Swiss-Prot record:
GTP binds at residues 491-498, 537-541, 591-594. Its main location: cytoplasm. Residues 89-123, 154-172, 187-197, 255-270, 308-334 have a biased composition (Low complexity). Residues 537-540 are annotated as: G3. Residues 491-498 are annotated as: G1. Keywords: Cytoplasm, GTP-binding, Initiation factor, Nucleotide-binding, Protein biosynthesis. Residues 126-136, 198-220, 271-283 have a biased composition (Basic and acidic residues). One of its GO terms (cellular component) is cytosol. InterPro entries: EF-G-like_DII, EFTu-like_2, IF2_II, IF2_N, P-loop_NTPase, Small_GTP-bd, T_Tr_GTP-bd_dom, TF_IF2_bacterial-like. Residues 591-594 are annotated as: G4. Signal peptide: none annotated. This is Translation initiation factor IF-2.
Length: 984
């Protein structure tokens, strides 16, 4: 506390009240104070003290006046007198009894009179005395002047002092009876400044005994009556009926055993010296003084002012030793300040005797007298009601209620978490324009808006797979070892990519390929004189764009194969774009230089237009001229690859769990789901658990590019892994985890999130979109397909190719697609949806064929993708209605008309152009306007029926059901021809 200002909480501690009461007093005085840390000036503090004293005085005058008797056992007087000499002036200064000065010399006689009066105490009182033999109870009141004014009227604040030496020479007392009807004088017994440091040394003791005395006033009264009735039966047990009387609010303080608190004397004395200069803060809690016992002796006078005291104060000295050192923030019950410190059991303590508990109340561990009471249960012995905590001066802000939501949440689950009914949430969604059902999923944005309507806050949580997946920290340089480069061969179809790889590997891959073209992405590990190289062979067909993109993503180098006789083609440009997008250096291999018509300069010029300038022309692109057929230039190409790989300094850490990419995946009939994995870092071993996309698994077996079993695979090594739970998507990341349980959990969470995203992403149907869809469906034909291929990459390539072919007139709907053989379920699905089954490099079993015949399902088989594309295109065109085209035949001019009975009007015509054919369609034109469209009923030349009449001849012509023919009309003959519709 500074010289000029004092904080609210410090002032509350000084006045032994809660900060909220100081704030209330300041508010009455119009003193601005917001919280307990606000400061007051000296003048403001003085006003607040006066206000608090006035309020506490009013409260004291309302207290009852029943007698309260607290007994203490007689103790030896061997305690030290130093403490009493120190505290006696302060304690006796506030003694309120006018008869106390006369009692100085009468201590022995007073004690002799008091002891017999105390003997006939009730049995329950004596049992409690036995339990609390060491502590002696005293009723003390706050020592500050403010507390004094609060406790009693002003005229009674002064009392003669009691000398310390006489009090020290008094004999120990057996029982001390306090007058409960004199609360004013009781509050003054320890009212002095020197007593204030002692009050701070045992706040824990004080807090415990401050709890609630008021509900026990009846027991106190009963004890008083028992003392007056009995003379000598101290061992006699007697239970008195409890009566509810209005007694004063008192605090009973028992002292601990002096032998148990000697160790705390030094610390307590030092603390008392430090706080000696601070203002008074209230009464001194009980406990041994640091320097010795209190002096005994009778009080000045035989009783306190009030209803009468049974006996004068006994002269038993307080035991010496330090007070229990308890600060403002220490626990309420110290080891030696407890009523049970003398070894008395809790069971005995509960038998009908009033017991006192410490309570942690008020600021700094202090409790106001107005708050004492109300926490004791008089119905059952030894049981106490839970104490109420002080209310904070500041209103507590309501905690935000939170709902934990993953990627999406169903309406029913959302309602359950918020504790509301689902229709209420649906009503809110309808007001937001969302027609939702109870099982519909809501994304996190919609859920946030809805939760705000109910006062909730949405917290995005969920399963975090990052903590399970291995961290991608940067490996130390000493752990990195050189790895083989991954080289992807790209280029246009039929430019010799696979043939070049065969020449390098000295194998014959092309001989086993359908149509001589590559339709799968292949990974090959090749050992050369310059070191190991891993080649990825990608398809060049336009349908395999995704495969080429995957190859460029996982590679270190790209060999762009360009035929010397063809030059740069469409897929060549696409491959260049993929390589540039992946940031991969390109090495150009000009193939077929042995063929006639090879033009190297043309290739260089066309590549320069694509920003691939050769080194010969001042660029930085490496060109190599090779012939896969004659093996010319292969050594130079490998030399260039080794040089480029050395520049890149390719390294990886093999001593860690493996990570890689799925290059290709398929469903093998005997082995299940199999994926070709290119390891990028770490080492993949047999038995490792892994997760890949929404699938998990364990490595059951590994095969290298030559089909041989492998036990492990290091960085840049391609292996075929067996053990997937499902066919993974090509291009997915392959990650090893610590065990299969973690892998399965990650895969399940990914699958759940994927499904929730798909459900939440579904577009809502409006009237406009519904009508537009119906109109489109009526005009559009749909070709339903069930697609099965040998590998997952082919499925993706065919799907992309078919979707590119669909037009506004014909849509392609791939109902189901997958890698693996055609099964019975595929047949049944196609039958139910009127679909055609497309098999790419797969064949059905005999049983499946029989099912297809029974269900009348058509199955088409292909092994070359461009043949598949052509036939699907023809099938799509076949769904369209044929196009009807009108073909002009000729014209005839009407020169004369004849009326023939039973026939009608016959026109005599001259064929001016073309020819007129019988039974063809005609138009009758009059002044250029079409008057009639119909057919020729009869055609004659003279009297003979003819099939046709050529140009320049005359004929007679009758029209079907039309007779209004006039001279000068023009008859135009035409026919309708049906043509097959096209998708263009």
């Amino acid at each position: 506390m500074s010289e000029t200002k004092i904080k609210i909480k410090d002032l509350a501690t000084e006045l032994n009240i809660a900060p909220k009461e100081v704030l209330a007093a300041a508010k009455k005085l119009d003193i601005p104070a917001k919280n307990a840390t606000s400061t007051l000036t000296t003048e403001e503090a003085r006003k607040v003290r006066g206000q608090v004293q006035e309020a506490s005085g009013d409260a004291r005058r309302k207290d009852g006046a029943s007698d309260v008797i607290i007994r203490r056992r007689r103790k030896g007087s061997g305690a030290k007198p130093a403490a009493r000499e120190e505290a006696a002036p302060a304690e006796t200064e506030a003694q309120a009894s006018p008869a106390q000065p006369e009692a100085k010399a009468a201590a022995p006689a007073a004690e002799a009179e008091e002891a017999p009066a105390a003997k006939p105490a009730p049995a329950k009182a004596r049992k409690a005395e036995a339990r609390t033999e060491a502590p002696r109870a005293r009723i003390i009141r706050p020592a500050t002047p403010q507390a004094e004014e609060k406790a009693e009227p002003a005229p009674e604040t002064a009392a003669p002092a009691q000398p310390a030496p006489e009090a020290q020479s008094a004999a120990p007392e057996k029982v001390e009876a306090h007058d409960a009807g004199a609360p004013v004088q009781q509050a003054e017994t320890t009212e002095s400044a020197p007593a204030e440091p002692a009050a701070e040394k045992a706040p824990a003791e004080k807090r415990r005994y401050e709890v609630s005395m008021e509900p026990e006033k009846d027991s106190v009264q009963a004890d008083t009556e028992a003392d007056g009735d009995a003379d000598g039966g101290r061992k006699k047990k007697k239970k008195k009926k409890r009566e509810e009387t209005a007694g004063p609010q008192v605090r009973v303080i028992s002292r601990p055993d002096p032998a148990a608190v000697q160790a705390q004397a030094a610390a307590a004395a030092q603390a008392r010296e430090e706080r000696a200069e601070r203002p008074d803060r209230g009464p001194r809690p009980a406990g041994a003084r640091p320097a010795g016992p209190r002096p005994g002796g009778p009080r000045q006078g035989d009783s306190r002012p009030g209803d009468g005291r049974p006996a004068p104060r006994s002269g038993a000295p307080r035991p010496g030793g330090a007070r229990p050192a308890a600060g403002f923030g220490q626990p309420a019950q110290a080891e030696n300040s407890s009523p049970f410190a003398d070894g008395q059991s809790k069971k005995k303590r509960q038998k009908g005797r009033r017991t006192v508990e410490f309570g942690d109340k008020g600021a700094g561990g202090k409790k106001m007298r107005e708050d004492v009471g109300g926490n004791w249960n008089r119905g059952k012995k030894g049981k106490r009601k839970p104490e109420t905590k002080p209310v904070s001066t500041q209103p507590q802000r309501a905690a935000k209620r939170k709902i934990k939501v993953d990627e999406a949440i169903r309406v029913s689950d959302f309602a359950h978490q918020m504790g509301v009914k689902a229709p209420e949430i649906i009503k809110i969604l309808m007001s937001l324009g969302i027609m939702a059902t109870i099982n519909q999923s809501l994304d996190i944005d919609t859920a946030t808006v809805v939760a705000a309507e109910f006062g909730y806050e949405v917290e995005k949580v969920g399963f975090s797979e990052d903590e399970f997946l291995l961290p991608k920290e940067v490996d130390a340089d000493e752990l990195l070892l050189p790895r083989p480069p991954v080289v992807t061969i790209m280029g246009h179809v039929d430019h010799g990519k696979t043939s070049l790889l065969d020449a390098i590997r000295k194998s014959s891959v092309t001989t086993g390929e359908a149509g001589g073209i590559t339709q799968h992405i292949g990974a090959y590990h090749v050992s050369t004189k310059r070191g190991d190289i891993v080649f990825l062979d990608t398809p060049g067909h336009e349908a395999f764009t995704a495969m080429r993109a995957r190859g460029a993503q996982v590679t270190d180098l790209v060999i762009l194969v360009v035929a010397a006789d063809d030059g740069v083609m469409e897929q060549t440009r696409e491959a260049i774009s993929h390589a540039k997008a992946a940031g991969v250096p390109i090495v150009v291999a000009v193939n077929k230089i042995d063929k006639e018509g090879a033009n190297r300069d043309r290739v260089m010029r066309e590549l320069a237009e694509q920003d691939l300038v050769p080194e010969e022309w001042g660029g930085d692109t490496i060109f190599s001229y090779v012939s896969a057929k004659t093996r010319e230039g292969l050594d130079d190409l490998l030399e260039m690859l080794a040089l480029q790989a050395e520049v890149l300094e390719l390294k990886a850490n093999p001593d860690k769990p493996a990570r890689g990419r799925i290059v290709e995946a398929k469903l093998d009939k005997g082995r299940g789901a199999v994926g070709t994995v290119l390891i990028q870092e770490g080492t993949l071993k047999h038995g490792d658990a892994f997760v890949c996309g929404v699938f998990s698994g364990r490595v059951r077996a590994m095969f290298n590019d030559q089909g041989k079993k492998a036990k492990q695979a290091g960085p840049s090594i391609p292996v075929e892994v067996q053990g997937f739970e499902g066919v993974p998507v090509a291009g997915e990341e392959f990650i090893c985890v610590k065990d299969e349980k973690v892998a399965r959990r990650i895969a399940e969470q990914r699958a759940i999130k994927q499904r929730e995203r798909d459900l939440a992403r579904e577009s809502k149907v409006t009237l406009e979109t519904f009508l537009a869809r119906r109109k489109t469906d009526a005009e559009t034909q749909t070709l339903n397909l069930v697609l099965k291929a040998d590998v997952q990459g082919s499925v993706g390539a065919i799907t992309d190719a078919l979707r590119k072919m669909q037009t506004e007139k014909v849509k392609v709907d791939i109902i189901h697609s997958g890698a693996g053989a055609i099964t019975e379920s595929d047949i049944l699905l196609a039958s139910a949806s009127d679909a055609i089954i497309i098999g790419f490099n797969v064949r059905p079993t005999a049983k499946v064929k029989d099912v297809a015949e029974q269900e009348k399902v058509e199955i088409r088989f292909y092994d070359i993708i461009y043949k598949l594309s052509e036939e699907i295109k023809s099938a799509m065109a076949g769904l369209l209605a044929p196009v009807v085209r009108e073909q002009y035949l000729g014209q005839a001019e009407v020169r004369e008309t004849f009326s023939v009975p039973k026939v009608g009007t016959v026109a005599g015509c001259h064929v001016a152009d073309g020819k007129i054919i019988r039974n063809t369609k005609v138009r009758l034109l009059r002044d250029g306007v079409v008057i009639y469209t119909g057919r020729i009923n009869s055609l004659k030349r003279f009297k003979d029926d003819v099939k046709e009449v050529a140009k320049g001849f005359e004929c007679g012509m009758g029209l079907e059901n039309y007779n209004d023919i006039k001279i000068g009309d023009i008859i135009e003959a035409f026919e309708e021809v049906e043509e097959a519709a096209t998708l263009d």
